[in-house]
Amino acid sequence: MTNAVLNEKNHSVTSEETKKERVRILAPRVDIYSDEENIYLLADLPGVEEKDVQVQLEKDQLIISGKTSNKDIQGELRYSEFRTGEYKRTFTLTESVEEDRISAVYKNGVLNLTLPKRKPLTKKIEVRSE
């Protein structure tokens, strides 16, 4: 009886998987560099349209994502080396950034992010004698 339940569950899972289109997750290639004022990130997202690029900042997590497909192809696809699917990559920021000043420019399949570093707050503490 136990085997029948397991087989049925496995069959259901297998059936559901075959119904869904498999989505391929791709990690975009990046270059990251910085200077005293900014962190710069360049992400290669070939084939992704600007409207499909997303950049999110959640606490110290920077998330880059986008989608590409080969929907516009006419005729029967015989051979393909183009990468299609979803791009997604998450980075943990090791420095504080000014969220309101982050800029993102997308041109020729390359996402260029500029993340201004937050200036360290220094507070002078008064020392008293007792």
Swiss-Prot record:
Organism: Leptospira interrogans serogroup Icterohaemorrhagiae serovar Lai (strain 56601)
Cited PROSITE patterns: SHSP
SUPFAM superfamilies: HSP20-like chaperones
Matching Pfam families: HSP20
InterPro entries found in the cross-reference section: A-crystallin/Hsp20_dom, CS_dom, HSP20-like_chaperone, Small_HSP
Protein name: Probable 15 kDa heat shock protein
UniProt keyword Disulfide bond present: no
Domain sHSP: 21-130
Keywords: Stress response
Family membership noted in the UniProt record: Belongs to the small heat shock protein (HSP20) family.
